[in-house]
Amino acid sequence: MDRFNCILNDTEYIYYLKRNKKFEKDRKFCKHNLKHFLDVARIAQLINLEESLGFNKEIIYTTAILHDIGKSLQYENGTPHEISSWEISKEILHNYRYNEEEIEIIKQGILGHRDKKSENFAQLMYRADKLSRLCISCKSIDECNWGDEKKNFKIYY
């Protein structure tokens, strides 16, 4: 988990984390912050262990902290955040010596985390991302654009 922890302290990573916070300052719906990222990581790792999927813990955690890192660019210029998150992540991953195989897995997780039909690692990230949202206690649930079929009214992890 050394590389993962280095990313958490990376100047560029912190810059985009702060940008997300700035753009979501007045947002009343789910935020795209470190708490969300770590919720996704922990849920994905629990699913990984429960279902014996065999994914590497550091790859799961790394993907989770990067999957929404470009959300501010979606607010700013309309770029889908999975695309901007991947663009930001590429250089960061190379800086901390992730190998090409690891980078490809992380890429699939970031780019596929919004696609219900995604497979393998991307499907794990999709599931964890959705399960991380606490709709059951949300004060803005009635205004949320998620349909009831998507909202979490139960806690699984």
Curated annotation (Swiss-Prot):
SUPFAM superfamilies documented for this protein: HD-domain/PDEase-like
First and last residue of the signal peptide: none
Pfam family, one: HD
HD domain residues: 33-134
Domain of life per record: Bacteria
The protein, known as: Uncharacterized protein Cbei_0205
Source organism of the structure: Clostridium beijerinckii (strain ATCC 51743 / NCIMB 8052) (Clostridium acetobutylicum)
